[in-house]
Amino acid sequence: MRNLKLLQTLEFKDIQAPGKPQCFSLRTEPGTVLIGSEHGLIEVDPVTREVKNEIPLVAEGFLPEDKSGCIVGIQDLLDQESVCIATASGDVILCNLSTHQLECVGSVASGISVMSWSPDQELVLLATGQQTLIMMTKDFEPIMEQQIHQDDFGESKFITVGWGKKETQFHGSEGRQAAFQIQTHESALPWDDHRPRVTWRGDGQFFAVSVVCPETGARKVRVWNREFALQSTSEPVPGLGPALAWKPSGSLIASTQNKPNQQDVVFFEKNGLLHGQFTLPFLKDEVKVNDLLWNADSSVLAVWLEDLQREEDSVLKTYVQLWTVGNYHWYLNECLPFSTYGKSKIVSLMWDPVIPYRLHVLCQGWHYLCYDWRWTTDRSSGDNESDLANVAVIDGNRILVTVFQQTVVPPPMCTYRLLLPHPVNQVTFCALPKKSNDLAVLDASNQISVYKCGDSPSMDPTVKLGAVGGNGFKVSLRTPHLEKRYKIQFESNEDQETNPLKLSLLSWIEEDIFLAICHSQCSPQQSVIHRLTVVPCEVDEEQGQLSVSSSISVDGIIISMCCNSKTKSVALQLADGQILKYIWESPSLAVEPWKNPGGFPIQFPYPCIQTELAMIGGEECVLGLTDRCRFFINDTEVASNITSFAVYDEFLLLTTHSHTCQCYCLKDASIKTLQAGLSSSHVSNGEILRKVERGSRIVTVVPQDTKLILQMPRGNLEVVHHRALVLAQIRKWLDKIMFKEAFECMRKLRINLNLIHDHNPEVFLQNVETFIRQIDCVNHINLFFTELKEEDVTKTMYPPPVPSSVQQSRDPGGTKLDLICDALRVAMENINPHKYCLPILTSHVKKTTPELEIVLQKVHELQGNAPSDPDAVSAEEALKYLLLLVDVNELYDHSLGTYDFDLVLMVAEKSQKDPKEYLPFLNTLKKMETNYQRFTIDKYLKRYEKAIGHLSKCGPEYFSECLNLIKDKNLYNEALKLYPPTSQEYKDISIAYGEHLMEEHQYEPAGLVFARCGAHEKALSAFLTCGSWQQTLCMAAQLNMTEEQLAGLGRTLAGKLAEQRKHSDAAIVLEQYTQDYEEAVLLLLEGAAWEEALRLVYKYNRLDIIETNIKPSILEAYKNYMAFLESQSATFSRHKERLLEVRELKERAQQVDLDDEMPHGQEADLFSETSSIVSGSEMSSKYSHSNSRISARSSKNRRKAERKKHSLKEGSPLEDLALLEALNEVVQSLDKLKDEVYRILKVLFLFEFDEQGRELQKTFQDTLQLVERSLPEIWTLTYQQNSAMPVLGPSSTANSIMASYQQQKTSVPVLDAELFVPPKINRKTQWKLSLLE
């Protein structure tokens, strides 16, 4: 759905040269034009309008002096730096334009009618006056000469296998006589010049020749190969015209055919058979086709037509039509009418061989025109809610308009057609947002027809419905109506006749103001901006007038123009990429350079064929796309693989060569973020990217909707709903409290319905009644309930592109599900509880803890009291629906848990249960006492806590059964709440609970339970086992033990405490309960409690113990500390040195591996491609054993292997980790030793062991300093550095990537991360004794 848009026009005329132009050719490298006349050859630069060379051929005798000479062909030869000229008299001349030297390289006595060079300029073909074809090499050496008329069909002659005869075949309505009809041949067309036509295929392997057969007088097309062997002859085609053009892509040969009532362009295959056609918009014998020309990429077919003389005084014209094809339909995209008289009569035209959409036209009077076209999609702006997403396609004198807001139909179908009196060249939509559905059409007669959408008193005859019409169908579409046609008033009509496309880039900026571009007549490097204003006139006049209210000249050729209706600015792009700015609301027509935020003028590095204006991060920017898929924002290239783009609202949508469509929000974006996102091969945000079909291009975006229209290369359409557009539109609807629109869109496009709440929980909970009233559908509300989940989808599935400022309002005492269910249920009960009965039931079921009992009770109420409301549901319907939400067995159990047997029977009847199974069970239950009945039900339902509650009310005779259930199900805490603490049942349960805790080795809790219920002996045993000596002695006091029993208990306790290294507690027990203070002192000395031992010595006045026990113990402890410190210091130093050595060895090994793995020589590319595969198998080979015993290793073996994972054995794989672990242990043990050293230093000083104290203090200080100095050297690497992923980027090299990869292979697992954190040393601990310094 694209049209051809004229970018620029280059023109020169009135060159002072003799004679009249006859033909022309192009020199692609210098960009000049070679024009031949009856006098000779001239070379003109179309930009500077200067004559570069003039080669007279009359003076050299190659052309006659009577001006009757004719040049039939000109060809620029790049490799020979010369120009080849062929004259009708038969001379082939080689001209060097640098030296002006002429050389006649050959002559044909019978004359030359056609000279045609192959596309590769290796061969040249001459058609002579003797009806022969001569093929020569590029050095003009003859290869072969053959007759142009051949009797043979060619090498590709069809083979008949003899199946059936013509006489026996079916001939349709013509009957059997058709088999005996003699085929007649129509002669050539009356206006046919009978000259041969030659055309080459794009690759130069074949050429086709159209000639008039001397026998039949009809045209035939023959195909020859490069070796000059005839391949095929076309089937007889009545009315075949002389025009011939082989499609460069090689598939079809175009020609023309006159039919009884029309004139067609027909296509031949290489085998000579017809394959398709399209009809020209003229009647038979109204025009003749002079020539057909394909552009370089086979996308545009130019048809050169000329009016035939019908009346004496009729004005004859020549037309150049540009036809394009899409979805197997041919569109007439442009029509250029020229006069057949005077300077504007066309002499020749040709496509540029390098620039595909550049057309060169040569007219009489030395008038030359050069047109540059590009593809464009003419669509409405989409800046307003009333915009219908219109897209207009030009097809001759018709405009095919598709309204994508209401219909999506594939081209060439459309919503409606606009019929105009002349072929259309340009179409534009109004830039005003409220008028964006109005469109203006510029036709070939330079009239502008304005169509406006609105109420019209009658149906406009120029507007015809397309795909939305039909008998019996009511059309809801408001079609536009023709308001008026405007004639543009030019200062000179002569310019319009010589250049039919005087105006380009037409834009409708205000209701009565247009902007258009025209090339300057004064200078080829200037453009003129015209401001066209509607001339006031009478309303009843059929035709209005547009006058040029103001004009301004711009240095440079304007090739594109785009508008922004919000800022009222227009961006004009010059051919060199420079951007100019024009504010259309300014009183004067003035332009200025477009500047970036830094104040510098913006210039695209390359000219762009599509430009748009967009607000990016609050700054208005110019976006451009080149024909080479390079995408620019201002003067910054952000991507080089963009095939199309569109700006919609605050979004930028792009399609790429990687067959993706990306959508970016421009509201808070920047050029750098867009550049980073488009250059990244992986897009993290799932909203941004989606895959599309290969070759897709953006057509338009439907406003206030989620539809993105894409067109495939063949022409068919595809509608996609881009996730970013969908979510953005849903968020807008939710912000406007438009729940119904949001819900319908989410349901259709499978967006999680949790977003309705999670987008703004507070607003949703405040508007739940609005939500219910808007949805107003029971099934839809149930669907909403069923999709609810506790997850916040705005943080997981649909994170907003910009962090939301909405505060998540959540009740700290409830969950999301409970809040929504309760709020919606209250709203539905207020609105209509009978209508919304099923959603109310769903709200109970969907809660975090399903309230099935309440649900069943509501269903039971429905059974007894059927409401009279017509919207109400019956109990049976409610129960059926409930069975869809909840498993029937679970529902049966919950109904049983209500103790309502009527409800149980109602549910059981809907289940698959056998009545023989549940009826006896229910009958048995009915016969039981109420409490025991409920106990039995709860026990059956495994609700044991409720079961013991009911059983406890049944009386003492059931206590044994209750106690057994308590023991079996471990319900001690719940059971203790059911009986008073003074009861015997309470004591029995407590004793059972304590025994259970003893079995679980929870001795202290067991002792507390026993003590609480008065079982002191059991409590003493439990406290004694766990070493709780205070509670043990308390229980002993309550048991009234004798002193002897208490002393024995004390010694037992002291022994257990000593085993647990609780020497101080053991000493207290021995001193206070066994009066054995000497043993207490020994235990204190063993526990290094020096000061407490001295206290007891002085308390009992046993000073002799100081000499006999205390001092020797202190000296012994001193020696042990010294030995320990020396051992730790030596271990630390040894491990540290080994760690540094291991690290150095690993670095060397990595470098060796890197050198070994780096590929060299001719196989480097192969190894680089397979390196990832090799490394992957290498890493997994350690664990690819097939021995099943390894996988079945017991947990004991696994724990053993885990302990052996870090081995200090030299050369082990993780030796460095084992050394770090050992060094960490040394540091921590030394840090914990500070308090002990401080205590022994005090007693060493007290007993005058100053030398030993100073030595211990100095040794400990040296050891600590050694450790502190070594910490930065040992813990240099962090875990993140050690496990870094391969670094990629513009600054990376092959070596750095491979080194990072090697580092990744040897990285540590996550569980060992804490080893790389240096241990913390508490420097605040005071351990030094200043008296020893």
UniProtKB/Swiss-Prot annotation:
Name this polypeptide is given: Elongator complex protein 1
Pathway named in the protein's UniProt entry: tRNA modification; 5-methoxycarbonylmethyl-2-thiouridine-tRNA biosynthesis
Pfam families: A-sol_ELP1 (PF23925), Beta-prop_ELP1_1st (PF04762), Beta-prop_ELP1_2nd (PF23797), HB_ELP1 (PF23936), TPR_ELP1 (PF23878)
Chief place where the protein resides: cytoplasm
Family designation: Belongs to the ELP1/IKA1 family.
GO biological process terms, semicolon-separated: tRNA wobble base 5-methoxycarbonylmethyl-2-thiouridinylation
Annotated disulfide bonds: none
Entry keywords, A to Z: Cytoplasm, Nucleus, Phosphoprotein, tRNA processing
Species, as recorded: Oryctolagus cuniculus (Rabbit)
Biological role: Component of the elongator complex which is required for multiple tRNA modifications, including mcm5U (5-methoxycarbonylmethyl uridine), mcm5s2U (5-methoxycarbonylmethyl-2-thiouridine), and ncm5U (5-carbamoylmethyl uridine). The elongator complex catalyzes the formation of carboxymethyluridine in the wobble base at position 34 in tRNAs. Regulates the migration and branching of projection neurons in the developing cerebral cortex, through a process depending on alpha-tubulin acetylation. ELP1 binds to tRNA, mediating interaction of the elongator complex with tRNA.
PTM description: Phosphorylated.
